[in-house]
Amino acid sequence: SKKYNKSAYALHNLNLTLNHGQIIGLLGPNGSGKTTLIKLINDLLTPTEGTVLIDGELPGVHSKNIVSYLPDHSYLDGSMKIQDLVSYFADFYEDFSEIRATSMLKDLNIDQTARLKTLSKGNQEKVALILVMSRDAKLYILDEPIGGVDPAARDYILHTILSNYNEHATILISTHLISDIENILDRVLFIQNGELVL
């Protein structure tokens, strides 16, 4: 459970296990608690009650090494060139494949010498997703990866997710665009008013 100050619970008595090798949809309206759950898993928030375990351990150094996280707002430095972002990720994450990232960027005809802020919003989101999916993680957490892009870009993003993750890994995709991703999901979690209803 997670409570902010003395207000109502943002998440209440949530009890779930995410299994290996599944693509899981985390669905629910805006404000339902999806991002709070994601932040708890990523150790960006601390539960008010209960615990979060990742690979049998509390979130920390170990989980940072096995979780690849795409937040709903970009955290990347817009002044950096794409090729420098790729190098940065390669230096920072041992499981990052520079070859995979470069190949996907070429497929999209993204100029790797361009600065991130000069790209369209859709291409910036694709770059962020490519960086996340180029890791060989055990758990991928994607917060609204298709929220701000056109339908063609959504198709590419879903294809990228499906073709570039470790099949033994788990992917948790948070979205309110249910119809766009339901055909790729193995399991659906629906959160409403901070509680799991499905």
Task: Report the location of each language-model feature.
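ABC-family P-loop ATPase nucleotide-binding domains
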Residues: 72-127
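The feature captures the beta-strand-to-loop junction immediately N-terminal to the Walker
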Residues: 27-29
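Catalytic Walker B motif of ABC-type/P-loop ATPase nucleotide-binding domains
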Residues: 140-144, 149
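Helix-to-loop junction immediately C-terminal to a conserved catalytic motif
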Residues: 42
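Conserved ABC transporter NBD signature motif
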Residues: 50-63
